[in-house]
């Protein structure tokens, strides 16, 4: 590291300490006489050099701990991304807790094309069924930083899901002093959350912490509740200049669903049988009395599927990680990691009597032990599996070269079943009769064996003013699915085994960072990526075994940008062009080598996006260091490049990708121990289908928080704080998450109404 960077880092650390004690940062600068070297931010704004990605060759931004702790207690790590430039995050509720209500898009990519890591442990795929979505694995209170690269993450980060974007979650190391924190939150919709963490302190190089959080609340839309129990732990043993770290996460989650609705249902023009409309459109909290549609079957009416107890989700996830870091000599550093994950869970969805009767008749003469349907069916899907892997990375500083190389190996085994069962009396409120299967739909196992390695060289030239990254990675994923993938497999008495390998041995990444001076940088990058096809299990379950598997989606990403890090402001602006090829789409076509027409997933073309992103923070001196501003602005045009089947979509906008995204906020620290923030988030209109025949309006929501007690202690507690968070202050009524379609009206999840949360915390 250059001497100037060391000096700048030391001054910034000093500034952070002073802010924590309540003294204005600008006063420190004047006293020390080093205002030219000091970057001024605020105690609730991310550290400047981290926030704008200083020294990174790609557009990399971050949320540091100070900003994370200002969010509502219990907010998911995924929803926090909405404060970063370019990330269109939609959530079904204010905390982002409901898993099937979350969506993310950035540049040309969606949630399943983004790579997520926790302390360098790859999260694999983000599917709610069988995947490892990041929001199950973190509590905000334990995070040190969330770093996101919207275009292309570093070539050394392991992921088979990413077509470029990478989001990395880094947790805290255990505190060297014994202590802890407890907090309790109450909020709208009967929300209650408790968090507790105990740091064990350091003893002969050993340190560690354990934490737990317990959250319970009602759905804001309709009957039902959410319940989550979450535990984390970390042990660290420092050995000389190296360290061994063990960490674990356990998550137990249960919730009821809420329905997606069309614009017609939202507007009340769909002729809903129960008179529902607007954003409060929900499942029923009672069993209605409906006309019988099949003689002798009391609960044969299809509308009985609107009872809320027929739509639930439950997940249990366990993750264990072990990391060993050590220097080897004076120039080499080795990092070894291993992890193991196990999961299980289930989901319930209803099936109408008429549908179940047809499926029962199709299978009853082939599969023994089936029972005729009695009414509404209990649809049970179960998931279980394990994921295990190892990572290794070696870095070597050799003159102007900083060399690194590494490997990642992973095995992912996943098992899924799906059956329909009778319920007592056929009633939607009857207990499930798991000894009376009506028909079978799935019982398969899928595996993914991944091998990835990378090599990278960072050259420091021109007296360390120019840094050039030259690297590449090789990725290979062997996939297999075997068993009963769909009802047709049961009917045909077949248990196919289908395999496919996706690999690319040369995926380059090139980047450069040039220091114009000690405050300004220019950066640029180019990268190529390949990813496991999104929803691979669904792809290979959609048709007969004769249908061919698709090629992997691939991408290219170009970026060029500028960063400024000044005494009273910092900013980053980047222009980009990104695309991905071999886009996947299901449609009817003749299966190659036969005359049979089937609907199966095929590679149908490309998506390209271009645009610009700005991120900045400003703390003007003329306001006495008590007020600071932050803002992100993104402009993005994402378009289809090719038609498919009979749909002329070339040149059409990709649905759910807004053209404009803006977030901004102002933070006011009037006195020591008090922080007030007001922020806004605007998303422009979005198309909702491929042919662009429908769109949903843009919206702006305002949020605020008041934090009191910073620096206040009493009795055994070093710090006692109170925080109030208000989300959607003006109670904006809008449609958020979109379930896109090809050429028909889409379905939506309404955005949550105004919510208020109170949190009291104490540290000891």
Model region roles, listed by residue range:
Residues 150, 165-200, 210-222, 679:
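Short strand-turn segments of transmembrane beta-barrel domains in outer membranes
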Residues 4, 530, 576, 581-582, ...:
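C-terminal beta-signal and adjacent terminal beta-strands/loops
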Residues 78-122:
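Extracytoplasmic beta-strand/coil segments of soluble accessory domains associated
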Residues 36, 137-181:
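A beta-strand signature from Gram-negative outer-membrane beta-barrel systems
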Residues 104, 122-150, 170, 264-266, ...:
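Short acidic/polar hinge/loop motifs at secondary-structure boundaries
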Residues 400, 461-465, 568-570, 575-580, ...:
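Gram-negative outer-membrane beta-barrel transporters
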Residues 37-72, 103, 126, 148:
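N-terminal periplasmic "start-of-domain" segments of outer-membrane beta-barrel proteins
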Residues 236, 243-321, 348-379, 431-434:
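Acidic/polar loop-and-plug regions of large Gram-negative outer-membrane beta-barrel proteins
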């Amino acid at each position: 590291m250059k001497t100037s960077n060391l000096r700048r880092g030391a001054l910034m650390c000093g500034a952070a300490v002073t802010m924590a004690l309540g003294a204005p940062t600008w006063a420190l600068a004047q006293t020390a006489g080093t205002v030219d070297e000091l970057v001024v931010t605020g105690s609730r704004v991310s550290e400047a050099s981290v926030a704008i990605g200083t020294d990174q060759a790609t557009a990399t931004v971050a949320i540091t701990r100070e900003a994370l702790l200002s969010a509502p207690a219990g907010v998911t790590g995924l929803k926090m991304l909405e404060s970063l430039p370019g990330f269109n995050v939609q959530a079904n509720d204010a905390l982002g807790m409901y898993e099937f209500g979350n969506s993310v898009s950035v540049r040309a990519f969606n949630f399943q094309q983004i790579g997520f890591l926790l302390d360098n442990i790859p999260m694999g795929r983000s599917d709610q069924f069988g995947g490892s979505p990041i929001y199950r694995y973190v509590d905000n209170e334990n995070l040190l930083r969330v770093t996101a690269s919207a275009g292309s993450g570093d070539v050394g980060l392991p992921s088979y899901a990413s077509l470029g974007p990478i989001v990395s979650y880094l947790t805290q190391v255990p505190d060297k002093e014994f202590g802890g924190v407890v907090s309790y939150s109450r909020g709208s919709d009967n929300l209650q959350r408790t968090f507790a963490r105990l740091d064990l302190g350091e003893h002969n190089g050993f340190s560690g912490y354990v934490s737990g959080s317990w959250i319970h609340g009602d759905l804001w839309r309709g009957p039902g509740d959410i319940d989550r129990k979450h535990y984390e732990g970390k042990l660290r043993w420092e050995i000389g200049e190296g360290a061994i770290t063990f960490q674990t996460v356990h998550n137990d989650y249960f919730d009821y669903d809420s329905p997606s609705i069309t614009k017609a249902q939202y507007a009340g023009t769909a002729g809903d049988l129960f008179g529902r409309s607007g954003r409060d459109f929900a499942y029923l909290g009672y069993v209605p009395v409906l006309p019988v549609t099949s003689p002798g079957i009391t609960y044969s009416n299809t509308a009985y599927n609107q009872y809320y107890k027929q739509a639930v989700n439950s997940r249990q996830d366990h993750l264990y990680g072990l990391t060993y870091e050590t220097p080897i000599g004076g120039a080499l550093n080795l990092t070894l990691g291993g992890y193991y994950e196990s999961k299980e869970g289930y989901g319930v969805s209803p099936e109408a009597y008429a549908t179940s009767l047809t499926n029962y008749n199709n299978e009853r003469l082939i599969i023994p032990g089936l029972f005729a349907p009695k009414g509404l069916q209990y649809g049970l899907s179960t998931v279980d599996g394990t994921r295990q892997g190892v990572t290794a990375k070696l870095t070597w500083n050799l003159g102007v070269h900083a060399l690194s190389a590494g490997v990642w190996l992973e095995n992912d085994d996943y098992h899924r079943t799906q059956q329909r069962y009778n319920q007592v009396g056929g009633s939607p409120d009857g207990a499930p009769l798991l000894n009376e299967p009506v028909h079978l739909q799935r019982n398969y196992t899928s595996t993914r064996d991944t091998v990835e390695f990378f090599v990278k060289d960072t050259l420091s030239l021109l007296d360390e003013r120019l840094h050039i990254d030259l690297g590449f990675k090789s990725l290979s994923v062997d996939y297999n699915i075997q068993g009963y993938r769909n009802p047709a497999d049961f009917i045909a008495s077949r248990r196919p085994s289908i395999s496919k390998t996706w690999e690319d041995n040369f995926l380059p990444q090139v980047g450069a960072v040039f220091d114009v001076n000690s405050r300004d940088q220019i950066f640029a990058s180019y990268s190529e990526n390949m990813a496991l096809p999104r929803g691979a299990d669904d792809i290979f379950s959609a048709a007969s075994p004769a249908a061919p598997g698709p090629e992997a989606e691939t991408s290219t990403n170009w970026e060029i940008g500028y960063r400024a890090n000044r005494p009273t402001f910092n900013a980053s602006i980047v222009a980009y062009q990104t695309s991905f090829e071999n886009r996947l789409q299901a449609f009817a076509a003749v299966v190659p080598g036969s005359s049979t027409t089937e609907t199966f997933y095929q590679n149908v073309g490309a998506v390209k996006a271009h645009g610009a992103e700005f991120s900045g923070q400003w703390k003007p001196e003329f306001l006495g260091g008590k007020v600071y501003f932050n803002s992100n602005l993104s402009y993005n045009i994402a378009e289809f490049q090719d038609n498919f089947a009979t749909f002329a979509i070339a040149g059409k906008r990709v649905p759910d990708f807004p053209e404009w995204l803006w977030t901004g906020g102002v933070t006011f620290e009037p006195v020591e121990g008090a922080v007030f923030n007001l922020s806004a988030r605007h998303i422009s209109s979005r198309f909702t289908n491929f042919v662009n025949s429908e769109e949903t309006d843009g919206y702006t929501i305002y949020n605020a928080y008041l934090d009191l007690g910073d620096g206040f202690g009493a009795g055994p507690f070093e710090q006692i704080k109170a925080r109030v968070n208000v989300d959607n202050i003006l109670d904006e009524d809008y449609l958020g998450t979109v379930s896109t379609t090809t050429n028909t009206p889409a379905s939506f999840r309404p955005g949550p109404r105004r919510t208020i949360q109170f949190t009291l915390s104490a540290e000891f």
